[in-house]
Regions:
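Short amphipathic alpha-helical patches
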Residues: 76, 180, 206-210, 231-237
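ATP-dependent adenylation/nucleotidyltransferase module used to activate substrates
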Residues: 1-187
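Charge-dense, low-complexity polyampholytic segments
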Residues: 125, 130, 197-203, 222-230
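Local cysteine-cluster metal-coordination motifs and their immediate loop/turn environment
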Residues: 111, 192-215
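Flexible domain-boundary/linker segments
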Residues: 47, 77, 147, 200, ...
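Short Fe-S-cluster ligation motifs
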Residues: 212-213, 217, 223, 228-238
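A polyampholytic, Gly/Pro-enriched intrinsically disordered region
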Residues: 186-190, 214-219
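Short, structured secondary-structure boundary patches
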Residues: 79-87, 208-217
């Protein structure tokens, strides 16, 4: 029996990854791992991560990292205001991404995931692979979502853990619209995913994540079931 831990934020990428691991890679035993790092969207992220775990008959595990919010200057911090971005802002997603980037976040997440899988192995003698929903974003936007980063973290696993635990990013070479198409084929309920940095009941529609979510559905030619307070009307700039 194959065992997997999937890092999940309740977003399209990680929820699709969880479905892919369960349904296509045939991992029978699944753990959905969620991190509470004080993000402003904690409520919606946790809600949809839990729903994902329930749908896939997976165990839900939460790790607290609230100190990360205290040291971060990112807009995930509830104390900072999120401004509406224009269509022209989407021309330079690298600049916009900097505002939401949490330094070393994915490295911190994966080190904790490694500690979890090694602890499980010591106690239960069950070996777990670790899956992440990284997509093709480029080193300039998010340096901790690249193939090079995944390779280096795997190198770290080999020298820091007693067993060779693998970290796998199956969607890392494809874009958001491709992930949406894949998710549709796998039966992902996109209404039960979240992207918004604000984290209210309805997606704001104007933060970078909401803009890219709308753009992804548009180019995937898949109906977007999301309710937005502000909806994009023109995608011709992309």
């Amino acid at each position: 029996m194959k065992n997997a831990i999937v890092l999940c934020s309740g977003g399209i990428d990680s929820v699709t990854t969880a479905h892919y691991v369960k349904k296509k890679l045939n991992y029978a035993n699944l753990i959905v791992l969620f991190f509470d790092y004080g993000q402003r969207s904690i409520a919606s992220e946790k809600k949809f991560s839990r729903q994902c775990s329930k749908k896939l008959n997976a165990k839900f595990v939460e790790i607290q990292l609230k100190w990360l919010n205290e040291i971060s200057t990112s807009l995930i911090n509830k104390k900072r205001k999120v401004k509406k971005i224009s269509r022209n802002d989407l021309k330079n997603t690298e600049k916009e991404s900097e505002k939401y980037y949490v330094p070393c976040r994915n490295a911190i997440f994966l080190v904790h995931a490694l500690a979890l899988v090694e602890s499980i192995f010591i106690k239960e003698k069950k070996k777990y692979d670790i899956f992440v929903g990284f997509k093709n974003e480029g080193k300039e936007s998010y340096p901790d979502t690249t193939e090079e980063f995944v390779k280096k973290i795997n190198d770290l696993s080999q020298i820091s853990c007693q067993k060779n635990f693998k970290i796998i990013a199956p969607l890392i070479k494809i874009d958001k619209e491709d992930i949406i198409c894949l998710g549709e084929k796998l039966g992902v309920d996109f209404k039960k995913t979240t992207s918004c940095y604000i984290g209210e009941k309805e997606h704001c529609g104007f933060c970078l994540a909401c803009r890219l979510r709308q753009e992804g559905f548009y180019w995937a030619n898949v109906k977007d079931p999301t309710k937005y307070k502000t909806k994009m009307k023109d995608f011709r700039i992309v």
